[in-house]
Amino acid sequence: MRTLLVFLLLTILVAVLIGNNQVEACTNNADCHGLGHCYRGTCFPVMG
């Protein structure tokens, strides 16, 4: 039961993050608040 609850919470979190990403399209790297790079209106996290 706990595993199902964790899975549902993670699914909701991912859906919210995807929704926010589509609503707030970036125009440059400053729109990503230093957490990533803007590419075609979407902020991608910086790895490494």
UniProtKB/Swiss-Prot annotation:
Residues making up the propeptide: 22-27
Signal peptide: 1-21
Keyword line: Amidation, Disulfide bond, Secreted, Signal
Superkingdom in the source lineage: Eukaryota
The UniProt record lists the keyword Secreted: yes
Tissue specificity as recorded in UniProt: Expressed in salivary glands. Highly expressed in the head, body and tail with a 2-3-fold higher expression in the head.
Methionine amide carried by residues: M47
Subcellular location as annotated: Secreted
Record flagged with keyword Acetylation: no
Disulfide feature: C26-C38, C32-C43
GO CC terms: extracellular region
Note: Does not show effect on voltage-gated calcium channels, potassium channels, and tetrodotoxin-sensitive sodium channels. Does not show activity on Nav1.7/SCN9A, and shows very weak activity on cation channel TRPA1.
Role noted for this protein: Leech salivary gland peptide with unknown function.
Family the entry assigns: Belongs to the annelide toxin family.
Protein name (database record): Peptide HSTX-V
The organism of origin for this protein: Haemadipsa sylvestris (Indian leech)
